[in-house]
Amino acid sequence: MKLMSWRRSRPDGTDATPSSPMKKILILTAGYGEGHNSAARALQSAFNENPAVEAELIDLFALRAPRLNNFSRRAYVKVINTAPKIWSAIYGWLDRSPLVPLTFKALGSHRELLGRLIAEKKPSAICSTYPIYAWLLNDLRHRGHQFCPHYTIITDALTINSLWFRTPSAGWFVTDPDSGAVLCTRGIPSEQVHVSGFPVALAFANRRPEWQPPELTRTTRRKILFMINSGRSHALQIARALLQHRDWEITFTAGRDLALQQELKNLAIGAPAQATVLGWTDDIPELLMTHHVVISKAGGATTQESINAYCPLLVSQIVPGQEEGNYELIRRHEAGALTETPQAIVTTLQRIFASDAAIWQHWRANLQRFAQPAAARTIATTVLSKSAEIGD
């Protein structure tokens, strides 16, 4: 493997730093839920801010068996959205059953590929945002492989599946103190638990001054962001209800669903509310920071991004298991509400904007106290510091 190096120049352009190998960081992710990938991308950006570090993102499942990975991802999304009780049973079994580790034996080819990648790239540290990797890495160690420390970045809050911590790791990074307490009560030493926050995109830490929602006055339109993740018929029912209010300005994000985009545009024609319909966009940080409220399911990335944008979240859907903890985090910190029907959404919006938006102001202030928008940098700094301590 060819190692990259960097040099610092003097004002006259001559070299002031001897060539030295780049410190390599491997970030392991998977596409089963956007939270894992979102966290991994943020970590990669944070590590790569250091000119002496090169962080590489790897989805082993997509790399080893792309067709199977695409099929299983689609199946996962379909199950959690159309058969939540089945997913709840699966999630509970994964959390409690002592037989779960035996199922990972079917990933032998994934484990061997991971071992080859580590041997080739010789990382100084490994970070993973998906729980299965810790099991594969531990299996490699039992088989005699020797490599750098591995750190687990837990992308769920409060209702944390034991898959995240039932196998060893050099450290665990969690979203909040209560989630840290969950690990400690399950036997993880407190010195290995780091309350860093969820690694959101660096745009949240680098917040531009103009990325603010409009000041709320009697004449200000309330800006509402509706991020549609699943369930077209339910989404259209919510959209119809939102569009009936003249003093609201609605932004819809419909992803890559072109048919849904067109249906939303048709609904918006002549509606009392102002409306903008977006497809897939990478401007989510800006959208969250410039809207007063976001409506969405309680996904890991969406929940944490709303927190770090100081944008109160109305939860329209909860997937049993991991998303229950995400909503509970919002509820405990009084930063949003559960609103699973169009009428509940409309009623809650009217309530939080009443009386000079007193409830909205309270929720936003709570988010500002609770948010950790620089979490990705915190994790990168901690991992690099520990790597230096062991003499890498």
Predicted regions and their residues:
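Active-site and donor-binding regions of nucleotide-sugar-utilizing enzymes
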Residues: E34, A89-G187, Q192
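Conserved N-terminal ligand/cofactor-binding loop architecture of enzyme catalytic domains
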Residues: A42-L117
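A nucleotide-sugar donor-handling region in carbohydrate enzymes
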Residues: A170-N229, G255-D257
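Donor-nucleotide binding loops and adjacent catalytic segments primarily
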Residues: W211-H292
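A donor-sugar binding/catalytic signature common to diverse glycosyltransferases
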Residues: E286-G325
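Conserved donor-nucleotide binding/catalytic region of nucleotide-linked donor-dependent transferases
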Residues: P342, T348-Q368, K386-E389
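C-terminal alpha-helical cap of glycosyltransferases
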Residues: Q372-D392
